[in-house]
Amino acid sequence: MEQTATTKQLLEQYYSGFARKEGWETVLSDDFLFTGGDMTRPEPLVGKAAYRQVIDRFSRVFDAMRVKEMIVDGENACVIGTYDFTFPNGARITGDVAEIWKARDGKLQALTIFFDTLTFQKNTPA
């Protein structure tokens, strides 16, 4: 039971910072694994710095986010996040992202995301 609370606390801290666009990276492991956003590249990006670059780009298009649902089972979790986006072309869209997490040794270790990539392609320049 202790591990479930720890994973939930890590996620709560991550999303609190993520919504503010600051302080979220403190709960990530240094060898953090991120998979998502490009179905043609299923291998994960490795490292907190590589993930930070992804989030720096992503932060330009999301205005707000909130956790819609969180299910935690030991070191595993699934979060449905609702994001409000404003794209460079002016389109404003609210959408959900499924986020599958793994924690290890008191840090968030891995994240795999699933979302509507076609909407992103249609609304962002190449």
Where are these regions (language model features)?
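Hydrophobic/aromatic beta-strand elements that line small-molecule binding cavities or substrate pockets
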Residues: 51, 65-71, 82-85, 96-102
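Short, acidic, Ser/Thr-enriched surface-loop or helix-capping motifs
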Residues: 29, 87, 103-105
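A short, polar/proline- and glycine-enriched secondary-structure boundary/capping micro-motif
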Residues: 90-91, 120-125
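A solvent-exposed, acidic/Ser-Thr-rich amphipathic alpha-helical stretch
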Residues: 9, 22-76
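Short acidic-aromatic low-complexity motifs
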Residues: 2-30, 126
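Short, cysteine-centered beta-strand-loop-beta hairpins and adjacent loop/turn segments enriched
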Residues: 60-61, 85-93
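Short beta-strand edge/turn micro-motifs at domain boundaries
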Residues: 99-122
